[in-house]
A protein has these predicted regions:
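Alpha-helical transmembrane segments and immediately membrane-proximal extracytoplasmic
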Residues: 1-436, 441-442, 475-477, 491, ...
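Cytosolic Rossmann-like ligand/nucleotide-binding regulatory domains
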Residues: 454-506, 510
Length: 511
């Protein structure tokens, strides 16, 4: 039986098989990501302690320089051996699901794990969440290859692994599912969402077993409801965050050019750019150790400290600049949590300014930390649903959902008006442009929904790329074989046979 025949049979597979596979992915990916998260947390604690001691013991600074350089060299060799461990990892997962990238799961898994732990532990302002998504996806890919699944089934497991990775990193299972649908897979498929949700829930259970049941960013006191008469402030905040988000994306997509210039000056190959980054971070570690790392501890501290406008502004500037420097190095590490941290600081700056103007009182400042995270991330990622649910799950307070929704929507609209792209899609385009072109013509099956733009049209009237065959249309649990005179029905699911390297092109045509 060839792969296409297997896909035809598995399209009607009972959902309990999807649940079973989701459990398998959730347990394994949850364990891998939870260990990754635990090691990073321990490494970050040690790093902060050493920096605090070094301020009073200059000899320790020499030790920090030595260790940082050794770690940077080790990570550089890991990157040289496997380029797909660079950066966040989310664009790599998206590229694989589109049939554009085909990395070795084991080669990426262990190198991303080790490189991420080393890089983030020295204090670089990188997030664990992007790598966690890639680690979850590669763990799931390994399971799929072990189970000898078809290419289509493998993609479902990879998507579920990505959801499980985010869930275990943030204890946010619903956001894990939404992120896969909104940012990675781009549409609902029954087998995808059942497998992904199961994997997310199981991975979250594994993570909760290790880290406890409090939300990742649980606030120390209950947040008050924001008065309706002041909602105009939320609109201003959304505009502010949208503009900042656009600026962030513009720079983060170009920071690599800065390192290319430095690389020419210091005669460094790209995999050793991190040698400069680990030196850049030392002054921040000595004088602002609480600003190091991904930023979750800083977000919690903002809630308790209520920093003045000048302090919050200084923190925002430092985090913005050094987050860019950290990510531009190409070290394994993401921008997911750093984006949330910049959003929290932006919200804090905004709230402090409006308090000085007399529009807010101090009890409302913590609300703006939450709103800043949701709006900033929603703008940069252009995944507003994920932003809203993620922040709500992380904070553990459903009462703020209305205000979060307003700010996230406005920030998203501003970002769209300014012409900003979803940051991970933009990174994927850059990645593909600098990767060897796919020339293979491996047939595989994909499923896509019939959208409003296609509903009511005849199949023979569609302009399809070469090698694309629409085989089946399923509507209200009724299956029909597709031919030229078949009329597409809104809400139906189409099963198509395409060349694997054309998945992205076909999805754009249908979605």
């Amino acid at each position: 039986m060839n792969e296409i025949e297997r896909d035809f049979r598995t399209q009607s597979m009972h959902l309990l098989w999807s649940v079973w596979r989701g459990v398998l992915v959730g347990v394994t990916a949850g364990a891998v990501v939870s260990l990754f998260r635990w090691l990073i947390a321990k490494g970050a604690q040690i790093s902060v302690t050493i920096y605090q001691e070094a301020l009073h013991n200059p000899l320790l600074i020499l030790g920090i320089v030595f260790v940082n350089l050794v770690f940077a060299i080790l990570i550089g060799y890991l990157i040289k051996q496997e380029k797909d461990i660079k950066g966040s990892g989310i664009p790599h997962v998206e590229g694989e699901l589109m049939g554009l990238l085909h990395p070795s799961w084991w080669s990426v898994l262990w190198r991303k794990f080790l490189g991420g732990v080393l890089g983030i532990s020295v204090g670089l302002m990188l997030g664990r969440e992007g790598p966690s998504i890639q680690l979850g996806a590669m763990t799931a890919k390994g399971l799929a290859e072990g189970l000898k699944l078809s290419a289509r089934e493998k993609r479902v497991l990879i998507a579920a692994g990505a959801a499980a990775g985010l869930s275990a990193a943030f204890n946010a299972p619903i956001a894990g599912l939404l992120f896969v649908v909104e940012e990675v897979y781009h549409h609902f498929s029954r087998h995808v969402w059942v497998t992904a949700l199961t994997a997310s829930l199981v991975a979250n259970a594994v993570s909760l077993r290790i880290f406890g049941q409090l939300p990742v960013l649980a606030m120390s006191e209950k947040l008050p409801l924001f008065p309706l008469k002041d909602y105009w402030i939320l609109i201003v905040l959304g505009i502010f965050l949208g503009v900042l988000g656009y600026g962030y994306e513009w720079i983060v997509l170009r920071i690599g050019k800065f390192y290319q210039v430095l690389g020419k000056i210091f005669h460094l190959p790209s995999h050793f750019y991190g040698l400069l980054t680990v030196l850049f971070i030392i002054p921040i570690g000595l004088y602002f150790p609480h600003l190091l790392g991904g930023g979750n501890e800083l977000i919690l501290a903002l809630n308790d400290l209520h920093p003045a406008l000048t302090v919050a502004g200084l923190y925002l500037a430092i985090r913005f600049i050094w987050s860019m420097l950290s990510f531009g190095s190409g070290f394994p590490g993401g921008i997911f949590l750093p984006i949330l941290t910049l959003g929290a600081l932006s919200g804090s700056v905004f709230a402090a300014a409006f308090e000085n103007l007399g529009f807010l009182d101090s009890t409302q400042l913590p609300i703006f930390i939450i709103l800043g995270m949701a709006g900033y991330f929603g703008a940069v990622s252009k995944a507003p649903l994920t932003a809203m649910i993620l922040v709500t799950e992380m904070v553990g307070d459903l009462h703020q959902l209305m205000t979060i929704g307003v700010v996230t929507l406005i920030a998203y609209l501003v970002m769209d008006f300014l012409g900003g792209e979803p940051v991970y899609e933009a990174m994927l385009h850059h990645l593909i442009d600098h990767s060897p072109k796919q020339v293979d013509k491996i047939p595989t099956m994909i499923d896509l929904p019939v959208t409003d733009s296609l509903a009511g049209r005849l199949v023979k009237d569609l302009t399809l790329p070469d090698g694309v065959l629409i085989s089946t249309q399923i509507f209200q649990d009724q299956s029909e074989v597709v031919h030229g005179d078949t009329r597409l029905k809104a809400g139906a699911t189409l099963y198509l046979v395409v060349n694997e390297s054309n998945i992205s092109q076909v999805r754009k045509l249908f979605l």
